[in-house]
Each structure stands twice: as structure tokens, then as C-alpha cells.
Amino acid sequence: MPTSRFIQRFGDRITGVLSGFDRLVLRGSLLAIVSVQGMKRLLWLKHVWLKDFGRWAQQMTEQLKEASCQAARDQNRPIVYLRSANTDKDEAARKIAAEDGITTGLVAILTCVEPCMSFEIYRNPQTHKLEPVYRLRKGLVLYHYWIDSQFGWMNARIQSWLPFSIQVCINGREWLARMMDHNHVGYRRHDNCFMSIDDVAKAQRLMNRQLRISWPKALQRIVRQLNPLHGQMFRGLGISYYWSIYQNEWATDVMFQKASDLAAIYPAMILHGMRTFSSGDVLRFLGRKVHGNFQGEITSDFKDRPEGVRIKHRVKENSIKAYDKAGNVLRVETTMNDPRDFKVLRPKHGDPHSKTQWRPLRRGIADIYRRAQVGQASNDRYLDALAATDTSTPLGELIRDICKPATYHHKRVRALRPWADPDLALLRAINRGEFSVNGFRNRDLQSLLFDHAADNDDENRRRSARVSRLLRMLRAHHLIQKVPHTHRYVLTPYGRDIVSAVLASQQITLQQLNKLVA
């Protein structure tokens, strides 16, 4: 069962666990015309000269705006121009829906000028010829907000300038509410969170169905709403939208019987996370140039909110966080913005008959099921880590075995020295919160265990060999395990308990110890 260790620890206070998409942002691109060569081909097929591009493109824009807004005029819904692109559009749309009593259908169309990628024609000073260029410009964007019969409250936007790029925002919990209403499953809801569900198992089955819908069909319906003239504009050219996932949030909600049940353990969990996951008040870890492929930063922090405290760990563009919602719900949520650090078992892109191998996860919706698997595994590992909070096993008994030599592949491996500085630094490194998302590699540990970059290749090899020996020692003591088909490692449940206990012991003062034994 997912989150089994957490359930074993706190199951008597929990009414159910629900996992699935929260925020899901998809983008549609007309791949045939998002490049200069693609646009040149379209102009050639449309018999449009480069000198006439501006006038022709403006006509296309006016046609799109007129057609996109026609439904609002027909239904007497407002079309509102926003002077600032920074205006909270969701808040503005919800205010309109509340004032007008809208419970289904179109709420409003909000328009504003925003930066967008589009085309323009310029004269090349070297060749003295007109050439199309694809660059960042500012153009009118149309945001449609509506209450969908399938997805519930949602929005989608389309830029009015070529190549008419689209972004669709859906919330999995909002979608689930519609599904439960249709299937007569009772629930109590606060915002995008369910405080209780009459039949959690059935709700989870419904949420799992979200992964199996025909996304091209569902999204084509949205395209027709945003641009009813798409078929007419590109008739006979075979130009259609390619859909990718810009961002997804996979959330696991643990529903407690009472708010007081969660309140009794949540502060200790946050404290546990801040201390043993190396997180604190605006505590940051800069991971610049950890290895040749790493260009981002690694950070962990926590934030006080009016409703409670949120702890968050980031690794490059991806993150995992934990926070309390609606009083009685603990949510752990993995956010994926960059899928390239994750793997999926698939053939080579564009060659379905090639050998199936573990390859980088793609942005396309074809890999949406794997995104769910990665998010669930990440959340489960994080909840496993939280389950180690305040263990009742005596520390001496817990660490006794790791303080003895072990055997690994018929070779003797030394004992850990958990309170010696070198091994303590190693335990802190493998317990960093961001490694709950996708594990860690030899090179990740090198960046944490050495103060500066290696001076030469020989030093690089020596460091790699040293860390390999440390990894072998951790595996011999069953603290970590290898992720299949990768060079990554994750803490085992046993390792979580050991490492959390050792690191937590570093925070205990003599005064606190005296109170415990008094």
C-alpha cells in the first residue's frame, strides 16, 4: 500500500489517503509553424509574399479574436481587458462568477497584452532581403474561464498572434469532484482539498481513471472553443496541436479524523523535516555546477502561512513540499517542471519499433502515466521519512548493528561511526530533502562532501572511488538501495529511521536530555 509506513504509524487517526493530480498545465503548439522554416512553408502554401506578411497575419489575428469572443457575446458574458498582465486572473474570474451566480458554462473572457513568441519580418542588412524571424514580442492573449461539465473550474488561454499557442490549466481535485458527483460519492470539500470522502477507495479509482482518458479528444474540444476557425484557417494543411505538459503537481492527501489529530503531530513533523532534512528558516543549499550537467540550485526552506507552516525542497526546477490544509489534511506534493531528470521505459522517440530502454521522460502527454508513477514514489518516500518522526525505539538499540562491521558481496565493510564528523556529513548528505524526489548519485555526494571542485582528472577519479566505497558501505548496512536501471540511490525505510534518529540526536541539548530522563 502506498505510504504504508506512515499508515502503520498513524493509521488509527487516519480516515483515508487520496493521491492524484492537483494542478495540471498543458501547452498546445502548432509544431508545423513554430519555426521560421515552417512559417515560410505556410506562407508558400497560402501564396503570401513576405512583404504582405504583416497585413495577412493581422487579418488572421482579427479573425481569431472575433471568433474566440463570439461565444461570450452570444451568452452575454463579459469580455474584460486587463491593463496589467500581473493581475490575478483566477481571482478576477471567480469574483465575476460569484457576482453573476455562474455555476456552469462560460464565466468570462479576460484579455491582456503579454510577452509571447511570434513572428515578424525584417530586412537583413547583409543580404538586403526580407526574412521572417521568430522572437519574443508583446501581443494580446485571450483567457477563457469556464466551469466545464467534465473538468469543473478551469481556464485556457490562446495568443492572438501566430503561431496561436495555447495553455490549458486543469485541477485534478476539481475534476474529481465532478466525477464523484456523477457517481454519487459523498464528500466534504474545502477549496481544492477533500476533508473527508464517504468512499475513499472508489474516489481513488475515479482519480486513477484521469490517467486513461483520451487527451487528444478532450483537448481538441478546448481548441474548438478557443479558436472555432482553426479548421478553416488551416484547411487541408494537416496542421494540428502537439500537446505537452508544462507543469504537473502530484499530491497525496492524508485525511485525519479530526483537526486536533493532525495538529498533535504536525509541528513535530515540520521540526523533524527542518532538522533532519537540513532545512530551516530560509536555509538554502546552492548546488551550482554540482556536475557537468547540473546548472541549477538546490534549496530547502519553510514558510509560515496564515493557515500553518509549509516545508519545501527544490532540486533545479522540480520540488517536493508538505503542508497542512483544511485543518485535518496533510498534503505531500511533488511538482515537476523539468522531466529530463527522470526516466521512462520506452522505445526511441519517433521509432516505435526500436529497442525499449530507460530513456529521459518527455514533456509530451504520452508519458503522463510515468509522471504519476514518479510523483507517487516521491510522495511515498517523503511520507516514509515523516513516519520516522519521534521513534520510540531506544537510539542505542536502533544504531547498534551499523556500529559493527558488515559483509557485502563476501567482502568485509567497516562499521559506521555515526557521530564522527566524516560519517555524520555523509548521513546529512544522503538525507537531504530534495533527494526524496529522485534519489542521489555519486557525483551528487561529491559536491556535498568536498569543499571545492577537483583540480584535475586524477583527483576526480580518486573522489569518485572514495564515494563509491562510501556507497558500498551504506549498502552493506542496508541504509540505501539502488534504483533499478539507474546510477541513483535512495534511503531504505530502515535507513530513514537510522539517519533521522542520528541527525535528530545532534539537535538535543543537555537541558532537553535531562527533561527526558527526569
Mark where each language-model region is:
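A short, conserved structural fragment
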Residues: 472-485
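Long, contiguous, compositionally biased segments that the model treats as domain-scale units
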Residues: 1-254
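Short, amphipathic alpha-helical interaction segments positioned at domain boundaries
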Residues: 487, 493-518
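Short, hydrophobic-biased segments on the C-terminal half of alpha helices
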Residues: 464-472
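Extended, non-transmembrane interaction/recognition domains
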Residues: 141-400
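Short acidic, hydrophobic short linear motifs in intrinsically disordered regions
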Residues: 436-459
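DNA-binding alpha-helical recognition surfaces that contact promoter or target DNA
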Residues: 447, 469, 497
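Short alpha-helical segments that sit at the start of domains
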Residues: 399-439
